[in-house]
């Protein structure tokens, strides 16, 4: 079973931790605020109140054995999230995903070794704007800065033509991974 460690239990971290647990994964939730630990204790596999910047404490909790650690530490001071990310990478955690507050924070997290960095407010804003102006897009899943999966209605001019005829890869740099029809 895949194991996750979620560090920082604000709205985003709590949502990630509980969703992963509800999907059947093993989740260790960490925060330095005991009230947040008490609130989530029955909603995840384990919960611990500790300073995530301290590598020795993380090792005692077995964080090193997690398949993925998600750093969701918020606030204006990026120091805690950067130092926590560094500690996780130094310990050898396989995958470290971080929440950033802005592009500068994202750049710093990438430089200290984060495997993936998301900016939830930015991603939600982009998705909302696209959905508001397009009646042809149903869903967008950002996989990385360069790749997304998009569920969309094709233009009428594409109907009845083969993928080869359309040359979508050449013209639009798009790979079609699935086709859903009304039939």
Task: Give the residues covered by each predicted segment.
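Conserved beta-strand segments of the P-loop GTPase G domain that flank and frequently precede/overlap
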Residues: 71-72, 153, 179
């Amino acid at each position: 079973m895949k194991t996750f460690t979620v560090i920082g239990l604000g709205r985003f971290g709590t949502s990630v931790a509980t969703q992963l647990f509800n999907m059947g994964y093993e989740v260790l939730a960490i925060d330095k605020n005991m009230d947040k630990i008490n609130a989530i204790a029955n909603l995840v596999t384990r919960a611990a109140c500790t300073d995530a910047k301290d590598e020795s404490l993380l090792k005692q909790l077995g964080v090193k054995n997690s398949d993925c650690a998600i750093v969701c530490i918020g606030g204006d001071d990026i120091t805690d999230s950067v130092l926590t990310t560094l500690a996780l990478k130094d310990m050898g955690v396989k995958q470290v995903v971080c929440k950033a507050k802005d592009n500068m924070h994202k750049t710093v997290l990438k430089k200290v070794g984060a495997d993936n960095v998301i900016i939830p407010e930015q991603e939600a804003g982009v998705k909302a704007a696209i959905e508001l102006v397009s009646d042809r897009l149903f869903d967008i899943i950002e996989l990385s800065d360069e790749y997304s999966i998009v569920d969309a209605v094709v233009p009428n001019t594409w109907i009845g033509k083969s993928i080869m005829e359309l040359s979508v890869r050449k013209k639009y740099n798009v790979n079609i991974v699935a086709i859903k029809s009304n039939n």
